[in-house]
Amino acid sequence: MKKQIATACICILSVTAFAQQAELTAFNKERERISRTGIKVLAGYSAANIIYGSIAAGQAAGSNKYFHEMNAIWNGITLGITGIGFLTAKKEGILSYNESLKKQHNIEKLFLFNAGLDVAYIAGGAYLKERSKTTTKNPLRLKGYGESVMLQGGVLLLFDGIMYAIHNRHGKNLNKMGEKLQLSASGNGIGLVVKL
């Protein structure tokens, strides 16, 4: 009888562990999908800005010429970065709960860090625009570049904020999975409780 009870317990734990791993794999695939979609959106925005900025810079005058010129330059760099990110992104294998948690925290921290950089871009653009008012050396270029950098920093801040919010909301599913596990210790040993 003891063998049958032990076998039944092992079977239940095995089925539960398999179900949790499948749930974890689905979670990780969704995180990858969210990131790939974000990269595609940013790449599309950048490509459109390169095309439009290049055309508009040739037709504009004054600070507007430099505004469009910087939009094309800025988004050329952004498109290069997103292209590298897309090409180097690899599908992950099966990750443990702890590995998944680490990946989730890292992606959220990345978007928060990027948001900080975006604020610095906006401040840098504001500095260039303000400097254009007091310099005699190409003030139109400083004004146009400053306005462009502020705009692009603002767009990136919006993008990074949205991506952080989406990943953060998705990460709450991982927390729910973790709540199903409870590790306890006593003087007699260590136990793992799996809530079914």
Model-derived regions, located:
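Alpha-helical membrane-anchoring segments
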Residues: G38-A47, F67-M70
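Long, highly hydrophobic alpha-helical transmembrane signal-anchor segments
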Residues: Y45-K65
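Loop-to-helix transition at the N-terminal end of transmembrane alpha-helices
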Residues: G62-T78
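Membrane-water interface of transmembrane alpha-helices
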Residues: G80-L95
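Extracellular/lumenal glycan-associated surfaces
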Residues: I122
